[in-house]
Amino acid sequence: MMYHIPGVLSPKDVARFREQLEQAEWVDGRVTTGAQGAQVKNNQQVDTRSALYAALQNEVLNAVNQHALFFAAALPRTLSTPLFNRYQNNETYGFHVDGAVRSHPQNGWMRTDLSATLFLSDPQSYDGGELVVNDTFGQHRVKLPAGDLVLYPSSSLHCVTPVTRGVRVASFMWIQSMIRDDKKRAMLFELDTNIQSLKSRHGESEEILSLLNLYHNLLREWSEI
């Protein structure tokens, strides 16, 4: 399943990010990809050795960790270190699949269950640059408002189309979920969102408490901690 997570960063935060990223040191984006991805990748990334990078990636981690909808959809166990990329002048990233595992500074290795892109450029400011994701439900083309995030299975083939005007800047990361199976995770998300909707409309009740108990028992049964 693919999820649109709105408002991860406020407009004020997005403007500050963009201003700071204009001063960043950018390097060839192929430094962080494997042999297969390097053949189709043509973009730039912020140098991960810079002090600015360290500060901004911490802010992204804090923002997603505090976003209730992100947590409900991803049920994260481990988040990768966020990276930042830039596309301009017809730069693109052809169809590829993300690696199944990635190194992690604290945990050694993590499994990539979900991929996330946090858009930092207004969609009207550039042409092209759609994230195209192929999954079992077909092909999806994604170009979200700045500050919004898209979450999708890392097992999906995906690409970024050429940016023919303007500049597309984004942050991206990977998530190891407490729930490895996409279908089970989707069922838990649907159950959770419906419980929250019922609570907002009708308040607390024995039936809602029973559904909440079911949710946590399923999470207990399926989670890998």
Curated annotation (Swiss-Prot):
Keywords associated with the record: Dioxygenase, Iron, Metal-binding, Oxidoreductase, Vitamin C
Domain Fe2OG dioxygenase: 78-177
Record PROSITE patterns: FE2OG_OXY
GO molecular function: 2-oxoglutarate-dependent dioxygenase activity; iron ion binding; L-ascorbic acid binding
EC number(s) stated in the UniProt entry for this protein: 1.14.11.-
Gene3D superfamilies in the record: q2cbj1_9rhob like domain, Rabenosyn, Rab binding domain
InterPro entries: Oxoglu/Fe-dep_dioxygenase_dom, PKHD_C, PKHD_hydroxylase, Pro_4_hyd_alph, Pro_4_hyd_alph_FE2OG_OXY
Binding site for Fe cation: H96, D98, H158
Pfam families listed in its UniProt record: 2OG-FeII_Oxy_3, PKHD_C
Necessary cofactors: Fe(2+); L-ascorbate
GO biological process: DNA damage response; intracellular iron ion homeostasis
Keyword DNA damage tagged: no
Bound cofactor: record note: Binds 1 Fe(2+) ion per subunit.
Positions contributing to 2-oxoglutarate binding: R168
HAMAP family in UniProt: Hydroxyl_YbiX
PANTHER family with a match to the protein in the record: PKHD-TYPE HYDROXYLASE YBIX
Protein's name according to its UniProt entry: PKHD-type hydroxylase YbiX
